[in-house]
Regions:
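A well-structured
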Residues: 1-313, 598-603
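Short pre-active-site segment immediately N-terminal to the catalytic Zn-binding motif
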Residues: 315-320, 368-390
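Long, K/E/R/D-enriched contiguous segments that form extended
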Residues: 295-333, 339, 350, 373-374, ...
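C-terminal, non-catalytic "cap/extension" segments appended to globular domains
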Residues: 6, 11-12, 21, 25, ...
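Short beta-alpha connecting loops at secondary-structure transitions
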Residues: 374-378, 405-415, 444-453, 472-474, ...
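Conserved helix-loop functional segments at active or binding sites
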Residues: 329-340, 363-366, 395, 399-407, ...
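Catalytic zinc-binding patch centered on the HExxH motif and its immediate surroundings
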Residues: 316-318, 351-371
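Post-HEXXH active-site segment of zinc metalloproteases
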Residues: 388, 399-423
């Protein structure tokens, strides 16, 4: 849709917009609560230095903090949702800016709590629990803070580290400025001979071109820019890795990875098991890349050939009007109680469907504890947006069940778990479409969508996770992370993952230079574990495993009342073992087998 044909926000039919009145009736009501929230936040500073006044007083402090957090979260949710629906609205811009300012004031006002709690001797805190039974309600919340006692420094050292925060973040800030503001990519000759400005946005689209010359030029010209700045980019990334290792060392962790995984109480064995299990099954990815090479009729498959469509235009489309029925049918294995939540999403206007001028791009699930779990879309009538819809509804159902079954303090859930709920829905949709359609072209398209999903999320994100850990280990051992060292080792790793059918040349060796996730401190592995767990659950739910379904719903209701690994064990999945990853790769193999067979039949 061109900019000229885009509706304004005022032109959007109300039925296709989300209903934000579950937050505030209007901006005046928002302002009235904002005034109250400012006073609540200001009052929190009076509790500083008082956590040694007994268990009952500690309960009072926690409740005051939670009450302020709830109100500020509500104010922020309304402001940012209003801004995201139309960023050109000046009133929304003001609301959003003021909400962020209030969030900063809240963070400053409660900054005393964790250090002060950690300064209490363990015996004192346990005495608080004994003398104040109502404090036991907050045991998990407090345990999650106090388990970091061994990694907490003195007050003066903590203050010093906090003051260094901006400096510690400077490698990523520098990379981001270079990558998003300073780099100037060339213009290339696009499809049909027209000039196309190469950008991060056009790069992905141009790699999908059916014209191999366009794909080659796009790839080579894109990496030419990174090659020009390879020394600087290596230095910036190296500094980021050194920062991770330094912070882990001063906090008495055995490694940067141990420090990063400590946040969610995830054993390091989960990470190692992912790398080992995926590494043992790379032959499946090699089969898939070899098949792509054959289908494209190429003597040599280059990295720029991995994204062009294998099957042409989609043989089926899905309209917004059809979406509800498809969602209800595809997610029927989740049971009537889950479908009631899906019905609420459509009937109660959780979803903001269509693009308009000023609306945020992409899709997400948002909201807060006592609001609707909203879904932002920019819907188009295609299969990708159908998958996006069920994905975001998976997040919203997770939020709805956590919020309705947990108190505010335990209602959130970790990133480690978040993608499981959303991707389980995607996998159920895949299963539904494969059961519904017997047309070979439709089945091929759905199978290809799934296979590409595993390639991009399980294999590719595991490759990133392996290289991220390799860099941290190399730096810890004193190896300089020069551009030569990074490029050659990344090229070798790429060859290991994609196999002999793909030419892993020096250009793809430079991919390390453009991956933002390498600055996120052991974040990226969670995409692969989450997708694998989701495939494990969806396979069993689709097969009618009622006991596992109930356990899975228990996970959706649990929020952060347990640590993520314990939540998954209770749901029937031990993520310290390799079984769930192997199960996912078996599904990949079975669908690859069918994909190959259907291709042979339709030749």
């Amino acid at each position: 849709m061109s900019e000229e044909t885009l509706r304004t926000r005022e032109q959007q039919p109300e039925a296709f917009t989300w209903d934000l009145t579950s937050l505030y009736a209007d901006a005046d009501q928002w302002q009235a609560e904002y005034d109250k929230a400012e006073a609540m936040v200001a009052d929190l500073t009076s509790y500083k230095g008082t956590l040694d006044q007994g268990g009952a007083h500690l309960v009072t402090v926690i409740e005051a903090i939670q009450a302020a957090c709830l109100v500020v979260e509500r104010l922020y949710a309304y402001a940012h949702l209003t801004y995201d629906q139309d960023s050109t609205n000046s009133a929304a811009q003001v609301l959003n800016a003021r909400a962020m300012q209030l969030y900063s004031k809240l963070a400053e006002a409660i900054a005393f709590f964790d250090p002060e709690l950690l300064s209490l001797p363990s015996e004192t805190l346990e005495a608080y629990f004994q003398e104040t039974p109502e404090l036991d309600f907050y045991r998990q919340y407090l345990d999650d803070i106090t388990r970091g006692r061994a990694h907490t420094l003195s007050a003066s050292e903590e203050t010093l580290l906090a003051q260094l925060g901006e400096i510690f973040n400077s490698p990523y800030s520098t990379f981001s400025l270079l990558d998003n503001a300073d780099f100037v990519f060339p213009t290339i000759e696009g499809p049909g001979g027209q000039a196309v400005q190469l950008t991060h946005g056009t790069y992905g689209r141009l790699l999908e071109s059916t014209d191999r010359r366009v794909r080659r030029d796009t790839f080579q010209q894109y990496y030419t820019v990174y090659n020009q700045f390879k020394n600087t980019l290596a230095n910036v990334l190296s500094t980021n890795i050194k920062t991770d290792n330094y912070k882990a060392k001063v906090r008495h962790y055995s490694s940067a990875r141990a420090a990063a995984l400590f946040r969610n109480n995830v054993p390091e064995s989960v990470y190692d098991t992912l790398l080992e299990t995926v590494g043992d099954h790379l032959g499946l990815l090699h089969r898939y890349t070899a098949l792509r090479k054959d289908l494209l009729g190429l003597d040599s498959l280059e990295m720029y050939d991995l994204y062009t469509p294998l099957l042409g235009d989609a043989p089926i489309k899905f309209s917004q009007a059809e979406a509800r029925d498809i969602v209800m049918e595809a997610l029927a294995p989740m049971g009537p109680d889950y479908l009631e939540i899906m019905a609420k999403a459509f009937d109660e206007r959780w979803i903001d469907w269509y693009e308009n001028k000023g609306k945020r791009s992409g899709a997400y699930s948002g909201g807060m504890y006592d609001s609707k779990p909203y879904v932002l879309l920019n819907w188009q009538d295609n299969i990708n947006w159908l998958f996006t819809l069920v994905h975001e509804l998976g997040h919203s159902a997770h939020s709805y069940l956590s919020r309705t079954n947990q108190p505010y303090v335990y209602s959130d859930y970790s990133i480690f778990l978040a993608e499981i709920a959303s991707t389980t829905n995607e996998n159920l949709l895949t299963d539904y479409l494969l059961k519904k359609y017997q047309d070979p072209q439709i089945r091929l398209y759905v199978l290809n969508h799934f296979l590409d999903g595993v390639k991009g999320t399980v294999f590719r994100q595991t490759q990133f996770a392996e290289f991220e850990h390799f860099m941290h280990q190399a730096d810890a051992e004193g190896t300089p992370l020069t551009h030569e060292f990074l490029t050659e080792n990344y090229r070798k790793l790429n060859a290991k993952y994609y196999g002999p059918s793909v030419n892993s040349d020096s250009e793809i060796g430079l991919e390390w230079a453009r991956i933002p996730h390498f600055y996120y401190n052991y974040y990226v592995f969670q995409y692969a574990t989450g997708f694998s767990a989701a495939t494990f659950f969806a396979d069993k739910i689709a097969a009618g495993d009622s006991a596992l379904l109930e356990a899975y719903k228990g996970f959706l209701k649990s929020g952060c009342s347990l640590y993520p690994i314990d939540t998954m064990k209770k749901a029937g999945l031990d993520m310290t073992q390799r079984d769930y990853i192997e199960a996912t790769l078996k599904v990949f193999e079975a669908r690859l087998n069918e994909f190959e067979a259907l291709l042979a039949e339709t030749k």
